[in-house]
Amino acid sequence: ETEVVYLKGCDYVDETVTLSEFDKMSADGRKGMKASFWNNRTLDGDPMRVTYFGEPLNLTNNGETAFAPDVPVVNFSARFEGRYVPAESGEVTFHVEGDDGFRLLIDGKPVIDEWGEGHKSDITYVLDAKKGRGYDIVLEYYQAYGSADLKFDLGERVPLDYKSVASQVADADAIIFVGGLSPHLEGEEMGVHLDGFRGGDRTAIELPAVQDRLLQALKATGRPVVFVMCSGSAVAMPWAAENCDAVLTAFYPGEAGGTAIADVLAGDCNPSGRLPVTFYASTSDLPDFEDYYMDNRTYRYFEGKPLFPFGHGLGYSEFSYGDATIKPLADGGEAVAVLNVPVTNAGQMAGDDVVQGYVRNR
C-alpha cells in the first residue's frame, strides 16, 4: 500500500505564505463561515441554499462544478459571513481572488470593492488586528457569465521557509512536486501584474523563481524528486530539467487529470505524449516579444539548442525502428505516396509510440 501525504509548498509566484487564521472565524457556533446562495446576481430575496465552510474558500465552476450542492453554475450570487477573533495583535492580510464581482466588508465597512464583471481580480487588504476583539467579516460575490472563481483566506503573511518545507517531506520515499503555471496567470486579458506576468501575457518564460528554489531545497533532501509541470505554454526550467529525477509535463489536464497523472506516476499507464511546442532554455533565447518575424522561433527556425525540442517525449518502453519505405501512388488521388515504418516495442511494458515524419521542400 502507498500512503500519499499532501503539503502545500508555495504559491505560484509569491515568496510569502499565509499562516491561515480562517479557523479563528465562526458563524452560528461553527468554525469558519456561513454561506448563503441566491439564484440571481443581486442577492435578492430569500437564499435558495445556506451552508457552512470550515476551510479557506477555493471555489470554481470549472467542469460544471457548483460552489455548493444545488447552486447554479452561472448567474448566481453568494454572501459569506463569519466573526473573526484574532489570538494575537498584529497585521492580518485578507486575500480575495475572484471572477466575477466581489466585495469584502469588515464591521460593515467596505475594504475591498471589485463589484464588476468579466475579469479576474486578485486583491489584498491588511488589517491592524487587536487581540481578542471580534470583527464581523462579510464577503459578497456574484457570477455574471463564463468562469466563476472565488478564493478567500486571511492570516499573517510570512516569508517562505524553504528548508522548513523540505524538512517536512525529508522522510518520504519520493517527493512529487506539482507546480508550473495557472490559467489565472496566463490567458486572455486579466488583472494580473506579477514578475513574469502582465495582464494575461507572459513577460518571461522561466519557471517562477519561488518554485525553482523550492525544487532545489527538495532535491537537497536526497530523496527522488518528480516535477509535475502544469502550464498552457512553454516553460524554461533548465535546473529542473537537469536535476529532477523526472519531469512530467501535464499542461492543463482537465477534470480527470489527477487520475491520469496518478496512473502514469504509479506505472499503470505508459506515457506516450509528445511536446506540441518547443521548450526553450531561457527568455533570452528568443527575439523581442513585439518582433513578429519568425526568425529564431519555433522548431522550424530556432537556431539555438532547445531545452526540449518540438516532438520530444519519453515513456517506460524503448521502441526500435526498422527501415522506412516509401511507395508512390499513381491513382491520381490527394495522397501521392505511402510511408511505412516498422516499429517494435523493445521494452517490458505495453505502450504506444508516436512516429514523427517531417517533409521539406528542396
Each language-model region and where it sits:
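Secreted, periplasmic, or luminal enzymes acting at the cell surface/secretory milieu
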Residues: T2-R41, G45, T221, C230-D352, ...
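Extracellular/secretory pathway-exposed regions associated with glycan biology
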Residues: E3-T93, E97-G187, G191-T203
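Extracytoplasmic/secreted envelope proteins and their assembly/folding machinery
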Residues: Y162, V169, D212-L215, G258-A262
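Short acidic, flexible loop segments centered on an aromatic residue
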Residues: V96-F102, D107-G108, Q348-R362
